[in-house]
Amino acid sequence: MSGHKCYSWELQDRFAQDKSVVNKMQQKYWETKQAFIKATGKKEDEHVVASDADLDAKLELFHSIQRTCLDLSKAIVLYQKRICFLSQEENELGKFLRSQGFQDKTRAGKMMQATGKALCFSSQQRLALRNPLCRFHQEVETFRHRAISDTWLTVNRMEQCRTEYRGALLWMKDVSQELDPDLYKQMEKFRKVQTQVRLAKKNFDKLKMDVCQKVDLLGASRCNLLSHMLATYQTTLLHFWEKTSHTMAAIHESFKGYQPYEFTTLKSLQDPMKKLVEKEKKKSSRRENREAVAQEPRQLISLEEENQHKESSTCQKEEGKSVPSSVDKSSADDACSGPIDELLDVKPEEACLGPMAGTPEPESGDKDDLLLLNEIFSTSSLDEGEFSREWAAVFGDDRLKEPAPMGAQGEPDPKPQIGSAFLPSQLLDQNMKDLQASLQEPAKAASDLTAWFSLFADLDPLSNPDAIGKTDKEHELLNA
């Protein structure tokens, strides 16, 4: 047996059983069951999960590094595009200002030329930022494709070993439920599963250590990469700001004493004719405003004159209204006096005195007074009844029997028949009549006060205290 290792038949049988197809199938079954539990998120053993807490923290850090590096690479690419676009636009603006400055020979042209040169210089200096950014992007991509990818492979192998280890633990848990140490039942099977668990744990611990070390190294290398590349970018950016600010400050100092210009941007293009029309409209509106401001005191004066004119016109209207009303009243009194004279047996000549007296047209201020006097004198015709009866007894009642000429509306003709009043006897009788009337008028006027009460009859018909209690026809007619 020298030179040869001797193994017992029991160890050879056990090794053969471990390599059997049945053992491999059982091992794959419990690994698949563990993967299913992890995928579905079912609750696992608390102690097993707690033993892997530090590993889970390292895995979370690794996934964060992987995600942030991908976002950083995308941001760098987008930032480079924006810088190129901004530099191009700034260069175009500088060229435009320079071209316009060459055409303008004033101070504004010089300022535009200097500003255009400064903008072109700034655009060129801004393009210098692309060099550290391109280097930064290359370093990040290298870090992603090498360091992170290598760590990711190690993490995948570690996860596979952890699944095998936890599956072996589930298998051992299931076998231990059927184990009976007193009867040595299932003892060989338990030992076989226990050996599988130890082997899986050994591989898992080794890969676990590798993953933790690689994640720590990955974090440190990422910090080193960012600090180095960002320092280069920061230096380039500071140089760019320094050169640009120095150039802009020099231009500002050189044109410090120049008068500033007010520039307006066009929101829409307009034709020259439209501009002229708008200018004319603005000028006309300004003129109208000035004229309105100048006419304000004149309008105030004219308002006072208009007020005075309105007051005078209203007074004239009121006077005009009062005159027709008085005329209407006089015509109504004349219309009423006609039937009253007929009832009182008054002569037509005396009844016609009232209308004849009112024929001349006096002034508007004296019309009311004349109408009142006519009303007063018309009542005196009631006292001349005795003289008319005596005249009728001596000379007859021929004149009374003659019908009085009627007008168009049944009223007596206001013109008296004076065709035969030129005989000597009639003239003598007329003189006698005037003398008797002049002697009787003062006495009758003092005794009879009905004329004065009839003056106020329009205001208060019941103002005659002498007529209260009297029922003769004369007072009834007066009250009516």
Swiss-Prot record:
Principal localization?
Answer: cytoplasm
Q: Can you give the residue ranges of the AH domain?
A: 50-253
Biological role stated in the UniProt entry: May play a role in neurotransmitter secretion.
Instruction: List the keywords (alphabetical).
Output: Cytoplasm, Cytoplasmic vesicle, Golgi apparatus, Membrane, Neurotransmitter transport, Synapse, Transport
Q: Where would one find the signal peptide in this protein?
A: none
The name this protein carries in UniProt is: Islet cell autoantigen 1
One MF term in the entry's GO annotations: membrane curvature sensor activity
Here the segments flagged for biased composition (Basic and acidic residues) are: 276-293, 306-321
Q: Which residues form a coiled coil?
A: none
Top-rank taxon, per record:
Eukaryota
Per the UniProt record, the source organism is Rattus norvegicus
